Amino acid sequence: MDVTLDTMFRGRLVVRQEKGGYRFSVDAVLLAGLAGVQSEDRVVDLGTGCGIIPLILAYRKKGRSIVGLEIQSDLAELAEWNVSTNRFSDRIELRNLDFRKVS
């Protein structure tokens, strides 16, 4: 898989994502910024992709715990790398599964 290494917030957030195919855009950044998430909320991100929304929420100290669900294993691997590299493993949990099977 060909990937790029991008940064946000003046280099304080590092994000690895596919060079082609699914890449996050300004929509995900706006959604994370406009979400009415408080510091003690629990959050689930369905179809988390590379984990950009949980990463932004954790960076902005929103959400006590965040779970990202991703069905595509290659994207789930990128999300795991991003969470670990940015040291948010204590607040973000990622699962490689089909959210339709969550009960």
Q: What residues fall within each predicted segment?
A:
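Class I SAM-dependent transferase core
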Residues: 1-38
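Conserved SAM/SAH cofactor-binding pocket of Class I
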Residues: 33-103
